[in-house]
A protein has these predicted regions:
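Conserved PLP-binding catalytic core of the aspartate aminotransferase-like
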Residues: 267, 280-312, 334
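Active-site phosphate-binding strand-loop segment of PLP-dependent enzymes
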Residues: 123-183
């Protein structure tokens, strides 16, 4: 199975064209028009190396998040930030709240960190029971939380993050928070862990999902601990962020029209998508805070449903390789209304079939 989902390129090489890719959680509005215009008029920037310190880029990211230049580290996608942070901090024992992004484990494996997992439970609608979590928390060096969570779409409000961090600080445990999807959360500006301004917290972000530019590869980290930043920079390769990625960060963060349109779309569409999916037989869906939905299959298994959906020109995410999930789960992106209708219709037809798994 592919680690991150549908591998649309492999399917296309096999002759499957015109697929709706619902395995990838990218903003359906596509690349912002203002960024496209800037790219067309900016080919001259390729004639020079990027600023090795990325001062203007970091200033823009800092202003967007209400922090200072010295709080920002940039990288070639959030993945570079993740691997840099683990390499710099070298936690001997790490607790991951799961299910979660597979790259956490890969990054920790490179430094031979002992990995423990704490499960989000279906009976809690995948929401973290904070008091129980703190009660059962083992001694470790680092806790990793994906917030909003991928693949469940659950979200831990800021006051609960503050409660968790306060307890972790007392125990000498650092907190790593992946906020790659937070801009899809309603009122996210008042829910981000940045507001805590805690030296104990490292926050990872990316432009990939919200601004629909996975091919650009621009991620960043936010820390209020200057020593963490220095350690990460010492391991960082020069010019890992290319000139167009730098341009993206300096352009898209200020595209208020695109941001407002996206926020309006996700507020309406996630509600509609959840309500419509509830009408489909033999599945269970969970309320989401973001642009994807976790689906439990009450009939058939994930690999079977994935193949049948491909026959209907739709790629879904087989979620069975997430920690604590199994072949009863798939994940669906939320896209534009026209395509969402097609996908839910296809899923309804698949779940009605009488074939045996």
């Amino acid at each position: 199975m592919d680690l991150h989902g549908g591998n649309i390129y492999r399917l296309q090489r096999e002759g499957k064209d015109n697929l709706l890719d619902y395995s990838s959680n990218i903003n359906p509005l596509g690349v912002p028009e203002k960024f496209k215009e800037r790219v067309i008029n900016s080919f001259h920037i390729l004639e020079k190396y990027p600023d090795p310190e990325y001062v203007e880029l970091r200033e823009n990211i800092a202003k967007y998040n209400g922090v200072k230049l010295e709080n920002i580290v940039v990288g070639n996608g959030a993945t570079e930030i993740l691997f840099l942070h683990m390499k710099a901090m070298k936690p001997k024992k790490t607790l991951i709240v799961a299910p979660a992004f597979a790259e956490y484990k890969r990054a920790l494996d490179t430094i031979e960190s002992e990995i423990l997992y704490y499960p989000l439970l279906e009976e809690n609608s995948w929401n973290l029971d904070v008091e129980n979590f703190l009660k059962e928390l083992p001694q470790c060096d680092l806790v990793v939380i994906c917030n909003p969570n991928n693949p469940t779409g659950s979200f831990i409000p800021l006051e609960k993050i503050e409660r968790i961090n306060s307890e972790l600080e007392k125990r000498g445990i650092k907190l790593f928070i992946d906020e790659a999807f937070i801009e899809f959360v309603e009122d996210w500006e008042n829910q981000t862990a940045i507001l805590l301004k805690s030296k104990n917290i490292f926050i990872m972000r990316a432009l990939t999902k919200f601004f629909a530019v996975p091919g650009v590869r621009l991620g960043y980290g936010i820390t209020f601990d200057s020593e963490v930043l220095k350690k990460m920079e010492s391991y960082k390769e020069p010019w890992s962020v290319n000139s167009f990625a730098e341009l993206a960060g300096k352009t898209m963060l200020w595209d208020s029209e695109y941001i407002e349109t996206t926020e309006k779309w996700i507020t309406e569409e996630k509600k509609w998508f959840f309500e419509e999916s509830q009408k489909i037989e033999n599945i269970r869906t969970y309320k989401t805070n973001v642009n994807f939905v976790l689906v439990k299959l009450l009939k058939y298994n994930s690999s079977y449903v994935r193949e049948k959906m491909i026959e209907k020109d739709v790629v879904v995410r087989d979620a069975s390789n997430f920690q604590y999930l199994n072949e009863s789960y798939i994940r669906l992106a939320i896209k534009n209304r026209e395509n969402n209708i097609k996908v839910l219709k296809a899923l309804e037809e698949v779940m009605r079939w009488k074939h045996l798994c």
